[in-house]
Design a protein with these regions (language model features):
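Hinge/lid segment of periplasmic solute-binding proteins
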Residues: 104-156, 182, 299-303
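Extracytoplasmic ligand-binding clamshell segments of periplasmic binding protein
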Residues: 83, 220-293, 297-305, 438
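Conserved C-terminal helix/tail region of periplasmic/extracytoplasmic solute-binding proteins
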Residues: 166, 383, 389-456
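Conserved N-terminal structural module of periplasmic/extracytoplasmic solute-binding proteins
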Residues: 2-108, 123-130, 309, 344-349, ...
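Helix-loop-helix "hinge/cap" segment bordering the ligand-binding cleft or interdomain interface
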Residues: 122-123, 140-210, 220-258, 323-331, ...
Length: 456
């Protein structure tokens, strides 16, 4: 039942991507290399890459497409997106027809001509782009062209072990990100060491992955609206300094990471039930994972992640359907993207999820589709009080931040910018560079990549 939206590792080959050939006219798949029209019926073979498609939310939507278009043979090369595999397929002139990729990579692939604009697909197939959440749609655009059809919408909130807080005499309201000095004191109070090493982390800032969220909380924008990197903004430097201080207060990076790596994040006996962690910010998919932990004594609590003015905020994550240059069945690919993300299909996915919920004798934790109307209607129809106040609060915190969440601006050098800040945070955590020096170097490298990048 666990529908997980996990980060995808960026293969090194992405950064070496060069411009790819244009759209091919030959159609070995028996379909159409054009993006179709509202009255065109796709046929032939649809080759998909990057889509695991194992759970009921995915399977119900695949079934919806196959039912609507029985003339299409769907071939899904199951597995997460692999950049090197994708680039090899594109450069060889034998790309898949549709690819499922993290939205933060769309700008890079669009700028370097590995994927094609979908404006004709959207127009000809009558895709209503107003149904998608604006922040998600923003991530798949470059220079006023749309290169992907978005789906899913991961946002963050603080999840908390009520047991850990009770043992330390800490109130749930003390897990807050508005007052950083108070958060540091709370983390220290919750932190437990044995033999000089962490035995319980008080508050995990989730570095390196959550650096963009901490920067946003401090008012920094890591990528400017035009796509130019802004990694060494003084507010970003301050955010990195603070979040690293939280780590250093709790054993230092080497000990902290070694201990954190022992967490059984997906197990019923995880870091919360084993009292290894008091609190951390994490995405909405994790609430569904924690359902199995209730029988192991989990006492879940939650607070929103806020900026320093006390307003709930979140970065967003999610995926997109893109059509590579040279796709042989772009018409079927377009209809696939439309069908998979439509209001009607999301309702079928929600029905499938509820069947699983009923079978598991569990409860609905939300479905965050990236389709605003679908989110609202599914929530109204299926979200009920769970009987567990902590889970109710967590679910509500995730829903409440949906309209406030912001994407990192798309960039023609999005992959390079992403790699640069991750390397910088790694250096700063390891102590091989100060946060400022690390981000200065990252900015220099990212800016050079941006200046060289084709702008779409």
């Amino acid at each position: 039942m666990k529908h997980l939206r996990l980060p995808v590792v960026l293969a090194a080959g992405t950064l070496a991507l060069t411009a790819c050939a244009g759209v091919g006219n030959k159609d070995a798949g028996g379909g159409s290399s054009s993006q179709g029209s509202a009255d065109s019926t796709p046929s032939g073979t649809l080759n998909i890459m990057g889509f695991s498609g194992e759970d009921e939310v995915a399977q119900s939507r695949i079934t919806a497409f196959k039912t609507a278009y029985p003339g299409v043979t769907v071939k899904n090369n199951k597995g997460d997106f692999d950049a090197q595999q994708f680039l090899t397929a594109v450069s060889s002139g034998n790309p898949p027809d549709v690819v499922y990729i993290p939205r933060n990579l769309v700008g890079t692939y669009a700028a370097k001509a590995a994927i094609q604009p979908l404006d004709d697909c959207i127009k000809n197939s009558g895709i209503d782009t107003t149904q998608y959440r604006e922040a998600a749609l923003n991530e798949v655009k470059l220079k006023d062209k749309t290169y992907g059809i978005p789906e899913f919408y991961t946002v963050s909130a603080n999840l908390i072990s009520g047991k850990s807080l009770a043992a330390a005499g800490v109130a749930v309201t003390d897990i807050q990100t508005t007052d950083w000095d108070k958060l540091e004191q709370t983390a220290k109070k919750l932190y437990v060491a044995k033999n000089g090493r962490p035995a319980r982390i008080g508050y995990d800032p989730k570095l390196p992955d959550f650096f963009p969220l901490w920067a946003m909380a401090n008012g920094a924008e890591l990528v400017k609206p035009g796509g130019e990197p802004n990694l060494n903004d003084p507010k970003a430097v301050e955010a990195l300094e603070f979040s690293i201080k939280l780590v250093n207060d709790q054993g230092g990076w080497a000990n902290f990471k070694t201990f954190r790596d022992t967490f059984d994040l997906f197990g019923a006996k995880n870091q919360f039930t084993k009292d290894q962690l008091a609190a951390f910010p994490i995405e909405n998919w994790y609430v569904n994972v924690l359902l199995d932990s209730r029988s192991s004594g989990l006492q879940l609590q939650s607070t929103p992640f806020t900026d320093r003015q006390g307003q709930p905020i979140s970065t967003i994550g999610g995926s997109a359907w893109v059509v590579p240059k040279g796709a042989k069945n772009a018409n079927a690919a377009c209809q696939w993207a439309k069908t998979m993300t439509s209001l009607e299909t999301w309702h079928k996915a929600a029905e499938a999820r509820m069947q699983t919920v009923t079978k598991d004798k569990s409860f609905f934790t939300g479905l965050f589709t990236g389709n605003k109307k679908a989110d609202e209607e599914i929530k109204a129809k299926y979200l009920k009080p769970t009987g567990d106040a902590g889970f109710d609060q967590a679910i509500n915190n995730y829903y409440d931040v949906l309209d406030k969440a912001k994407s990192v601006n798309p960039s023609a050098a999005g992959a390079e910018i992403d790699a640069a800040w991750k390397a910088a945070v790694g250096k700063a955590l390891a102590g091989s560079a100060t946060p400022k020096a690390a981000l200065d170097q990252a900015q220099s490298e990212a800016k050079a990549a941006f200046d060289k990048a084709p702008q779409g």
